[in-house]
């Protein structure tokens, strides 16, 4: 009789503990990321359309073709080229190794101007540069191609970064120079050091010109982050890398300036300036492109004809990857959209959490 009376009590106690566990201990299921295809277009001799007012325009460069497309999947410009080309969302130019006085055009194929020099044009958004023959000098141009100022050096330029107000260049001897875009004056000249064989393999400068991040050296290669104090750069963070990268690599400040990403052999590092935290994420292949939006950082890495897109959340965690085979590829972002170019196609995916 006593046993029968105790059974309901056991059931009640078990139910209470189960309910308390559900309330206090159970964690909600993680949200899954959904990739929704919006459209896919061919860039093989496409029909050319006009962009509507306010329609977002982006560039593509796949193999020996380049051009512009819109967020709604319209190709508005398509060019093939036998030799060399430079392109940004604002300008493009087709040229060869002997080119002089190089014409360049807007994203609507309208003549923009002529770069009054011989060399290799380089566009970053609406900024225009030309690297001069020899690889140790460059010029900054205005919107018509006229030379504004020129840096003439004797050491090979091994890394380069440009923002609206400042330009930074890294050199084979391990030095970094920062130039004022308005005047061309050299404001900073320093060497991160710390390695047996100094060379700057990758760098980026923050939009306000206050921070410079770089990967430098061989034999004890390291990543450094420096901050401008008056007319000097002070290293505020550094870490030695566990492997040496034998090639030029990417360093990238995020748009909000709070994080900087750097790629080296076998990994990507993410340094959070606000949290003073350095996170390492294994990425086996060389990263060739970094794009971002408000929620994610997308990285495109390459090993021969195998491309991998890695998605990093703003908590510096790798949320997922996917791979594909191609001879050439690119990625681009706009809001929640991810654009993937592959050989002769471009796809738009909407990325969301469910």
What are these regions (language model features)?
Residues 1-115, 138:
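N-terminal "mature head" segments of proteins
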Residues 158-276, 280-281:
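Acidic, serine/threonine- and glycine-rich low-complexity intrinsically disordered segments
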Residues 57, 92, 128-129, 167, ...:
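Hydrophobic beta-strand positions that form the internal "hydrophobic ladder"
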Residues 90-200:
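Non-cytosolic head/periplasmic domains of membrane-anchored proteins
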Residues 32-43, 72-81, 106-116, 145-152, ...:
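A short beta-strand motif characteristic of beta-propeller blades
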Residues 43-53, 78-91, 114-127, 152-164, ...:
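Repeated scaffold domains used in trafficking and secretory/extracellular systems
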Residues 63-68, 99-105, 135-139, 174-179, ...:
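Structural motif
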Residues 326-354:
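Blade-level signature of beta-propeller repeat domains, shared across WD40, Kelch, NHL, RCC1
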């Amino acid at each position: 009789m006593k046993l029968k009376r105790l059974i309901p009590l056991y059931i009640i106690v078990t139910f209470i503990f189960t309910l308390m566990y559900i309330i206090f201990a159970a964690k909600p299921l993680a949200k899954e990321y959904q990739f929704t295809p919006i459209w896919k277009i061919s860039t093989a001799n496409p029909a050319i359309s006009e962009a509507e007012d306010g329609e977002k325009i982006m560039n593509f460069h796949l193999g020996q073709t380049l051009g512009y497309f819109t967020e709604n999947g319209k190709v508005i410009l398509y060019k093939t080229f036998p030799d060399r080309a430079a392109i940004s969302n604002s300008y493009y130019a087709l040229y060869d190794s002997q080119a002089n006085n190089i014409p360049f055009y807007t994203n609507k194929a309208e003549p923009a101007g002529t770069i009054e020099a011989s060399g290799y044009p380089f566009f970053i958004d609406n900024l225009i540069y030309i690297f001069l023959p020899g690889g140790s000098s460059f010029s900054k141009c205005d919107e018509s191609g006229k030379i504004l100022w020129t840096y003439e050096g004797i050491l090979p330029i091994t890394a380069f970064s440009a923002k609206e107000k400042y330009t930074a260049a890294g050199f084979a001897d391990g030095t970094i120079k920062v130039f004022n875009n308005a005047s061309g004056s050299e404001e900073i000249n320093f060497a991160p050091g710390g390695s047996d064989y100094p060379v700057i393999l990758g760098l980026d400068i923050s939009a306000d010109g206050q921070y410079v991040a770089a990967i430098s050296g061989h034999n004890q290669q390291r990543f450094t982050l420096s901050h401008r104090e008056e007319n000097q750069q002070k290293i505020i963070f550094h870490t030695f890398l566990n492997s040496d990268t034998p090639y030029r690599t990417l360093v990238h400040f995020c748009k909000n300036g709070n994080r900087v990403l750097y790629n080296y052999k076998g990994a990507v590092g993410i340094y959070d300036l606000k949290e003073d935290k350095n996170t390492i994420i294994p990425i086996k292949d060389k990263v060739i492109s970094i794009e971002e939006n408000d929620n994610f950082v997308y990285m495109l890495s390459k090993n021969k004809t195998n491309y991998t897109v890695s998605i990093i959340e703003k908590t510096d965690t790798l949320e997922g990857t996917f791979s594909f085979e191609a001879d050439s590829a690119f990625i681009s972002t706009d809001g929640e959209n991810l654009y993937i170019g592959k050989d002769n196609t471009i796809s738009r995916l909407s990325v969301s959490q469910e």
